Regions:
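Metal-dependent phosphoesterase signature
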Residues: 56-91
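Cysteine/selenocysteine-centered motifs that mediate thiol-based redox chemistry or coordinate metal-sulfur cofactors
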Residues: 44-56, 60
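Short, flexible active-site loop motifs that bind/organize anionic cofactors or intermediates
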Residues: 2, 9, 63, 142-146, ...
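A broad detector of the eukaryotic-type serine/threonine protein kinase catalytic domain
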Residues: 24-27, 78, 143
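C-terminal cap/substrate-recognition subdomain and adjoining C-terminal extension
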Residues: 75, 82-194
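Short, flexible segments with low predicted structural confidence
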Residues: 27-28, 32, 44-46, 70-71, ...
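Active-site neighborhood of HAD-like aspartate-dependent phosphohydrolases
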Residues: 1-49
C-alpha cells in the first residue's frame, strides 16, 4: 500500500508562524507594525473565534502585497526561505527526510502561501493557500480557500482521491490541523517539541 506522510508547516515544521515572519522580512519592522495595528481589531476577533480566519488573513496579505509583481514576490519568497532555514525544527526535518528515504510520498499541507513554503522544500509537494495573480501582479486575493481545517482534507482528497489506496500519516500542531489529523490513519500532534 502506498504511504503518504503529510506535515503541517507553521508550528509543526517551523518554530513560528511564517506569515508574520515573512511580512516582517519582506516589508521591514515599521511597516509590519503599522500594518498589524491597522488590522488589530479583526485579528483579536479572529483569535476569539468571532471573525473568520481566512478574511483576516486575506486583509492582512492584501495590505502588504497587493500590487506587487509576482516576480518580485517570488524573489522575496526564495530569499526568505534561504535566509530563514533556522526556523525549521530539526527533528521535524529529520522525520520528513526519513519518510522520503523510506519511500513515502511526502506532502506539506499548509495555510501558508505556497510561494514561500515551496522554497524550503525543493522536492516536496506543497498544498497551501494560493494567491491570485492578474497580468503578473498580485491582486491581494486568494485563488483558493485558505488551506485550514477541513480545507486541508479537501486538498488531500483532490490530490489523492482514492483514500482506500494509501496509508496516511499526518503531523500537526493546532486546531487548523484537527480535521487532517482525524482523517489520517496515524496522527501525531505537536510531535517535534522538545
Amino acid at each position: 500500500m502506498k504511504q503518504i506522510v503529510a506535515f503541517d508547516f507553521d508550528g509543526t515544521l517551523t518554530t513560528k508562524d511564517t506569515l508574520i515572519a515573512f511580512i516582517r522580512y519582506a516589508c521591514g519592522f515599521r511597516a509590519f507594525v503599522m500594518g498589524f495595528l491597522r488590522y488589530l481589531p479583526q485579528l483579536v476577533l479572529m483569535k476569539l473565534g468571532l471573525y473568520p480566519n481566512y478574511k483576516a488573513k486575506q486583509k492582512v496579505f492584501a495590505h502588504f502585497f497587493k500590487g506587487m509583481t509576482i516576480e518580485t514576490f517570488n524573489d522575496l519568497c526564495q530569499r526568505f526561505a534561504h535566509d530563514n532555514m533556522h526556523l525549521l525544527r530539526s527533528q521535524g526535518i529529520k522525520t520528513l527526510m526519513q519518510a522520503q528515504d523510506d519511500g513515502a510520498e511526502v506532502v506539506i499541507v499548509s495555510a501558508s502561501i505556497d510561494n514561500w513554503v515551496q522554497p524550503f522544500f525543493a522536492d516536496v509537494t506543497v498544498l497551501g493557500t494560493q494567491i491570485e495573480v492578474e497580468n503578473g501582479v498580485l491582486t491581494g486575493r486568494f485563488l483558493t480557500k485558505n488551506c485550514y481545517g477541513q480545507e486541508k482534507v479537501s486538498r488531500m482528497l483532490a490530490r489523492y482521491p482514492h483514500r482506500e489506496d494509501y496509508h496516511l500519516t499526518a503531523y500537526g500542531d493546532s486546531r487548523g490541523d484537527k480535521e487532517l489529523l482525524a482523517f489520517a490513519d496515524e496522527s501525531h500532534y505537536k510531535p517535534f517539541r522538545s
